[in-house]
């Protein structure tokens, strides 16, 4: 998790009771930087290299780190220069593999949330499709900016796996930093539940 004190650093909290409670690791932080924006870790196990991968948002790029034990991290590469939209800070990264419909092929998808700089102003989620070898993500179409949703109410998208039918499930804010603090609710912000149907 990102520990926010005088600067943003990455720390560990672990559970020994199936997630009912968490203990902060005594040797936190496990990863530091001099960068002003250094946050939103996405950590996953990369089977091919037998290492943990951490993707972090750092200014207007994503940085990739690897570890064998979740405590000692090595910088592998950065992604972002000359890629996608750069109208604001890059946040909430995600990186995962998906099957390509109608083929036996799989491709990697990197999500990048941007604020401001969306196609209609304010916040938005862009994505990149390509390859990942455990160290470096390579975008297959670097001259294109791809948006996950063209509406104004889609930001901070994150995904998780391990659904019973092997789906990758995504969830996002149904809001925008242009007006997130001005919605007419007090116990929650924007809708509690929304669904999108159809093939689009």
Positions of predicted regions on the chain:
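Repeated scaffold domains used in trafficking and secretory/extracellular systems
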Residues: 91-93, 155-157
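Beta-rich carbohydrate-recognition and catalytic domains
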Residues: 1-40, 45-91, 99-150, 165, ...
């Amino acid at each position: 998790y990102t520990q926010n004190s005088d600067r943003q650093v990455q720390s560990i909290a672990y559970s020994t009771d199936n997630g009912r409670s968490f203990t902060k690791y005594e040797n936190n932080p496990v990863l530091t930087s001099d960068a002003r924006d250094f946050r939103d870790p996405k950590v996953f196990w990369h089977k091919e290299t037998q290492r943990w991968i951490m993707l972090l948002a750092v200014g207007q790029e994503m940085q990739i780190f690897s570890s064998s034990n979740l405590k000692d991290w090595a910088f592998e590469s950065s992604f972002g220069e000359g890629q996608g939209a750069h109208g604001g800070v890059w946040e909430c990264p995600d990186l995962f593999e998906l099957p390509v419909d109608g083929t036996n092929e799989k491709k990697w998808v990197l999500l990048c949330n941007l604020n401001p700089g969306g196609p209609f102003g304010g916040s938005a989620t862009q994505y990149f499709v390509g390859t990942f070898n455990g160290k470096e993500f390579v975008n297959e179409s670097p001259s294109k900016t791809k948006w996950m949703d063209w509406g104004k109410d889609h930001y901070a998208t994150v995904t998780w796996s391990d659904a019973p039918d092997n789906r990758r499930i995504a969830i996002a804010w149904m809001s925008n930093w242009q007006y997130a603090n001005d919605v007419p609710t007090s116990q929650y912000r924007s809708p509690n539940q929304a669904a999108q149907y159809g093939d689009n």
